[in-house]
Swiss-Prot record:
Residues 9-292 form the tr-type G domain. This is Elongation factor G. Its main location: cytoplasm. PROSITE patterns: G_TR_1, G_TR_2. Belongs to the TRAFAC class translation factor GTPase superfamily. Classic translation factor GTPase family. EF-G/EF-2 subfamily. GO terms for biological process: ribosome disassembly. Pfam families: EF-G_D2, EFG_C, EFG_III, EFG_IV, GTP_EFTU. It is found in: Cytoplasm.
Length: 703
């Protein structure tokens, strides 16, 4: 049996999260460089980044898949040389189309580093990932990056956290200089300044704080103490009694408050200019939790339903969550897992309690972004990748065969945008099916369906960029040649009234006939609740063996709604009466009867078409406020608020997705290229009557 290399209290599982272009991947690159994982620094804008390992990532300079890597930290001044820390890092995407990747990563992390652009502060996508991290109770530290950039303003960045995130966040460092003159960092806790002594920022030396900044540094230290004392009783007591607060006491209080999600330490630096990253790594080990510091993960015993706390302990039975599936060109299908308790050896069996299958782990790997180290055993609190788990998908629970548990699975959003994809040849058709299956395993927010009317394959996802990249991957990785249609909105249909309907199917044509007869009550379900089927049959008027066929018939019929053929969603169906024939009834007959009942109900159930409504953030110069307001109202949107962000205005609005196609060009020309916008799916809503009629007409169905 292998021996644990790093104790649990010296393990950190962290994510790097941010708005697109805040410098997240560059920050991760520097972490890998300073922890000795890479020997040459790669720049994102040169397409040489180690963590961005897919072709599309290198070309576009953005991170799409969260790459997991393991690093070892000895401390800024080698203070942990004898007892180093293992830091498992997940680099997550900042583009809204990939929030599913962020959500998955946060689910298995213990702590996170939020990276801000020092010239922009909190941006729309920062708010999105911050909310996601809050949902999963992930403690965070904040790294204000790009302090060398034109317009960088550290005080503004900290203030933007107060205003836009409404959180208790204060600086634990202060930059010396900004923009071209950013040269060093003051540690507010120790009241020392740190200056780099070489070009790559590997060696730094402590110096006295410059005289002109001494007063500011003391004032900021007091602000920090007050903010932490507000949420920490021990520190508050000392502070009120006017006692001196030592470096150790302040650091311990910051750690307690950060772990309790009541305080967020803010640091300054420039990853590109090699400043501040090692101090940020020290803050990761000083203030972010190890697996023993977070509240235990809760699992359920499938036999008794009892809740069981999973505490990181190697001596307990193995339990892990599969949080990502990837296809590696060299070793094939990889299952990334977070081990919550127990250990797992390569070659052993695990029980997938989500699919109720037993699987054998071929090999275990510790992953770097593009390379891997084979390991014999993975321990509790760790992240590793397994080869050989053929039936495991994202969100599945993996446990010891003799001690089965179900870990809470992940929920994935419904796609809001789709496009038709048509393979050029029969060979491409087969390759396309394989590509779709593999890509859907990797990304559960990517779906594929067949249009029942036209037979076209439709692929769907969270945004145009995501679908662009999926089509690109089909071409590059799976050699699929296909014609791709223009993006379409993923409309849905729903009933708004409760109705009862009969489905009666009888066919007699010599020999055995067909007979099925059902009475079903249909009623609207809550938004997002999906389809619910209730069997309310009394006295066997519909025999037991045909009831699953009724449910299956309804599920099939839901794929093409009555108005325009869009999926029918959020529906309750109660089977309450019916009849059967001893000889002629069959599963197929009841399936058809159920679909006929749904068709009948649609005539009087007040069916409507639903469209995805997006939460849109538009940032534009103040002079263009009138233009932006006009854009939103012309697109059937609702303005929800606006705020000033320095020289620009940020407008928040809710706008139907169908109205947002081509908006980037409109905004660019109205603002001379200075306006930007981001959007993320918010909810589905019924379309206005006139637009519903137009959609039905375009679908080729008659209203």
């Amino acid at each position: 049996m292998a021996k644990r290399e790093y104790p649990l209290e010296r393990t950190r599982n962290i994510g790097i999260m941010a708005h697109i272009d805040a410098g997240k991947t560059t920050t991760t690159e520097r972490i890998l460089y300073y922890t000795g994982k890479i020997h040459k620094i790669g720049e994102t804008h040169d397409g040489a980044s180690q963590m961005d390992f897919m072709e599309q990532e290198k070309e576009r300079g953005i991170t799409i898949q969260s790459a997991a890597t393991t690093a070892v930290w000895h401390g800024f001044f080698d203070q942990f040389a004898k007892t180093p820390y293992r830091v498992n890092i997940i680099d997550t995407p900042g583009h809204v189309d990939f929030t599913i990747e962020v959500e998955r990563a946060l689910r298995v992390l213990d702590g996170a580093v939020a990276v801000l652009d020092g010239a922009a502060g909190v941006e729309p996508q920062t708010e999105t990932v911050w909310r996601q991290a809050t949902t999963y109770d992930v403690p965070r530290i904040v790294f204000v990056n790009k302090m060398d950039k034109l317009g960088a303003d550290f005080a503004m960045s900290v203030e933007s956290m107060h205003e836009r995130l409404q959180v208790n966040a204060e600086a634990i460092q202060w930059p010396i200089g900004a923009e071209d003159e950013f040269e060093a960092v003051i540690d507010l806790i120790t009241q020392e300044a740190y200056y780099p002594v070489d070009d790559l920022g590997e060696k730094w030396e402590p110096r006295e704080i410059p005289a002109e900044l001494k007063e500011l540094a003391e004032e900021k230290r007091n602000t920090l103490i007050e903010a932490v004392a507000d949420v920490d009783d021990d520190l508050m007591e000392k502070y009120l009694e006017g006692e001196d607060i030592s470096v150790e006491e302040l650091k311990a209080a910051i750690r307690r408050a950060t772990l309790a999600l009541q305080f967020y330490p803010v640091l300054a630096g420039s990853a590109y200019k090699d400043k501040g990253v090692q101090m940020m790594l020290d803050a990761v080990v000083d203030y972010l939790p190890g697996p023993l510091d977070v509240k235990p993960y809760v699992a359920n015993d499938p036999k008794t339903g009892e809740e069981i706390d999973l505490i990181a302990d190697d001596s307990k039975s193995f339990a892990a969550l599969a949080f990502k599936i990837m296809t590696d060109p060299f070793v094939g299908r990889l299952t990334f897992m977070r081990v919550y308790t127990g250990t797992l050896q390569s070659g052993s069996y695990v029980q997938n309690t989500s699919s109720d299958t037993r699987e054998r782990v071929g090999r275990l790997l510790q992953m770097h972004a593009t390379s891997r180290t084979e390991i014999d055993e993975v321990f509790s609190g760790d992240i590793a990748a397994a080869i050989g788990l053929k039936n495991t998908t994202t969100g599945d629970s993996l446990t010891a065969v003799d001690h089965q548990l179900i870990l809470e699975s992940m929920e994935f959003p419904e796609p809001v945008i789709e496009l038709a994809i048509e393979p050029k040849t029969k060979a491409d058709q087969d390759k396309l099916s394989n590509a779709i299956q593999k890509l859907a395993e990797e990304d559960p927010s990517f779906r594929a369906t067949t249009n029942p009317e036209t037979g076209d394959t439709l692929i769907a996802g969270m945004g145009e960029l995501q679908l662009d990249i999926m089509v690109d991957r089909m071409r590059r990785e799976f050699n699929v040649e296909a014609t791709v249609g223009a993006p379409q909105v993923a409309y849905r249909e729903a009933f708004t009234q409760t109705v009862q309907a009969r489905g009666y199917f009888k066919r007699q044509s010599g020999g055995k006939g067909q007979y099925g007869d059902v009475y079903i009550e249909f009623s609207p379900n809550e938004e997002g609740a999906g389809f619910e089927f209730e069997d309310a049959i009394v006295g066997g008027v519909v025999p037991r063996e045909y009831i699953p066929s009724v449910e299956a018939g309804l599920k099939d019929a839901l794929n093409a709604g009555p108005l325009a053929g869009f999926p029918l969603v959020d529906l309750k169906a109660k089977l309450y009466d019916g009849s059967y024939h001893d000889v002629d009834s069959s599963e197929a007959a009841f399936k058809i009867a159920a679909s006929l009942a749904l068709k009948e109900a649609a005539k009087t159930a007040g069916a409507v078409i639903l469209e995805p409504i997006m939460a849109v953030d538009i940032v534009a110069p103040e002079d263009n406020l009138g233009d932006v307001m006009g854009h939103v109202s012309a697109r059937r949107g609702m303005i929800e608020g606006q705020e000033s962000r320095g020289p620009v205005l940020a407008v928040k609005a809710k706008v139907p997705l169908s109205e947002m196609f081509g908006y980037a060009t409109t905004l660019r020309s109205a603002t001379q290229g200075r306006g930007t916008f981001q959007m993320v799916f918010d909810h589905y809503e019924a379309v206005p009557k006139n637009i519903q009629e137009e959609i039905i007409k375009n679908s080729g169905k008659e209203a």
